[in-house]
Amino acid sequence: MSFLGGFFGPICEIDVALNDGETRKMAEMKTEDGKVEKHYLFYDGESVSGKVNLAFKQPGKRLEHQGIRIEFVGQIELFNDKSNTHEFVNLVKELALPGELTQSRSYDFEFMQVEKPYESYIGANVRLRYFLKVTIVRRLTDLVKEYDLIVHQLATYPDVNNSIKMEVGIEDCLHIEFEYNKSKYHLKDVIVGKIYFLLVRIKIQHMELQLIKKEITGIGPSTTTETETIAKYEIMDGAPVKGESIPIRLFLAGYDPTPTMRDVNKKFSVRYFLNLVLVDEEDRRYFKQQEIILWRKAPEKLRKQRTNFHQRFESPDSQASAEQPEM
């Protein structure tokens, strides 16, 4: 199965076909402009192999070149500084020495057990992408074609997955206890919890749980944080009473979040928070944030095939405590 498209130059068309293209799974990714693209899916350590096909469009023509190569590239691009892209992986295979093409040709290539240390990602201010890049080197203008791939990082966690339990409130006015069943959730998981009202002396009109995504790019004074509310779950609409307990069930699968990503190549991070929001009758808002870890669980078939997945996230116990506005 070939990648869609190709380079429609004046002489030849460049196309890439993966050796396992007929059976390899594809994945979707939303671009920065909101469109959904579908590309072949790879995991860390998998080989990438196939053929580069050069098809002449004009028989009898010649194409002089200074060499033909294919690269496997992993790249981070900050949207506010597109001139400063960073390549964290760049593998090169030379396909042909300088010479002349007079007819269509195919070249085999293979990148063995390629390290793909990060998950593919497109956010508000940053893009992390993997792609194959074919270059026909010429004296004046090279012929170049890129083919995107998608990489998913799989993580495993120990059986210990502590619940989150906290008591928060406003002195002599409001005192609540909230509990979430875990601190780490896979992307298709269900957040289960409960809110218990210990003291209620203000009139609460509305209460909701939000899943918030924070994308942090840059370092030091140039750090930029983009905050997005991924999901909202209405806990109650109306005044609670002392002793009331309200259950929480938030299904992550319906919102398609990414995994937590920490300090990716010292360029960016993606973190997730549960934000408990209360609104009183005077429209004052009280909130409390708690960071959680989201991770990608291996498909059942893959879990049986492989016994050792790379764990890319450190324990949440080792990270700095998140900003938590006082309620």
Swiss-Prot record:
Role of this protein: Acts as a component of the retromer cargo-selective complex (CSC). The CSC is believed to be the core functional component of retromer or respective retromer complex variants acting to prevent missorting of selected transmembrane cargo proteins into the lysosomal degradation pathway. The recruitment of the CSC to the endosomal membrane involves RAB7A and SNX3. The SNX-BAR retromer mediates retrograde transport of cargo proteins from endosomes to the trans-Golgi network (TGN) and is involved in endosome-to-plasma membrane transport for cargo protein recycling.
One GO location term (cellular component): early endosome
Region Disordered, residue ranges: 306-327
InterPro entries in UniProt: Arrestin-like_C, Vps26-related
A Pfam family that the UniProt record links to this protein: Vps26
Membrane topology according to the record: Peripheral membrane protein
Compositionally biased intervals (Polar residues): 316-327
Protein name from the UniProt record: Vacuolar protein sorting-associated protein 26A
Result for mutant: D44A: Decreases interaction with SNX27
Keyword Protein transport set for record: yes
Keywords assigned: Cytoplasm, Endosome, Membrane, Phosphoprotein, Protein transport, Transport
Any single biological process term in GO: endocytic recycling
Sites of Phosphoserine modification: S315
Primary location group: cytoplasm
Keyword DNA-binding attached: no
Oligomer and partners: Component of the heterotrimeric retromer cargo-selective complex (CSC), also described as vacuolar protein sorting subcomplex (VPS), formed by VPS26 (VPS26A or VPS26B), VPS29 and VPS35. The CSC has a highly elongated structure with VPS26 and VPS29 binding independently at opposite distal ends of VPS35 as central platform. The CSC is believed to associate with variable sorting nexins to form functionally distinct retromer complex variants.
Family: Belongs to the VPS26 family.
